[in-house]
Each structure stands twice: as structure tokens, then as C-alpha cells.
Amino acid sequence: MAAKAFSTAASPPSMAVGEDMNRPYILRAAAWLRSVQKTDGSFGETCQTYEDHSLKGQGDSTASQTAWGAMGLMAAAGPDDPAVIKAMQWLIDHQTPAGDWTEEYFTGTGFPKVFYLKYHLYRLYFPLTALSRYRRLLAIRQRG
């Protein structure tokens, strides 16, 4: 998930240059994200995925990985997609009273199977980016 969801989260630039979001590779990416989304709307994947590929898309939920999945789905399906709405709600529900998110798991790859990185701002940057994109897409839709 780390690599796949991160790359799908980067798809809004594809939209900006006119990429057809109904192309088969985009639809496959969105279908994969939906297949690994947890019933509560979150996403998570363990770093052990690099050693055991059967664990792809499985692991404890994290705010950064939920944001990555949500941004990929937003780009592919828009803000009204039920999977996007569930992910946004999970991010909102898991904010601390201070307005941030806790994240104890490593979500940075580093060198797979050698070492992993903990980017301390991922837990803030990516959820805020996802929520702001969601809000912007809703505002654009309302303006017509």
C-alpha cells in the first residue's frame, strides 16, 4: 500500500494535464484501493509487505495511509464516492483535540527489508492535504 497508495495519491497532477480518469489503469488503481479499504473507511499497510507480498494493503490504520488512499480515490472517482466519504470521516473522527493525528507506525520505506523511516510530519501533512482537496472539490461542485 505504501508505494501503491502513495502513487495513486499523486494522481491529481494527472487530472490537471487532462489525463482521462476513466483509463483502465486508473480504474484498476481505484478498484485496488477500494479492495483494501477497511470497513471503517481507513487504510493501513505494514512494512512487512516488502517481505510478504500477501500482506499488501493490510495492517493497522494510519492517518497518512488513509489520506493517500483517499486522495487516489478522489482523483479517480470524485468527492461523492462512498469510499472517499468514509475515508474523510475516518480522518475527522481520528483527529486529536489539538487537531492533529497520532501515528505510531513507520510508513516510510527507506530501503525495504533493511530500514524504514518515520517521517514525523506525514501524520499531519497528508491528512490535511486530503481534507483540503476534499473541501476544494466539494466547493467546485457546488459552484457548478
Labelled PLM ranges:
Residues M1-Q142:
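An alpha-helical repeat/solenoid feature that recognizes helix-turn-helix modules
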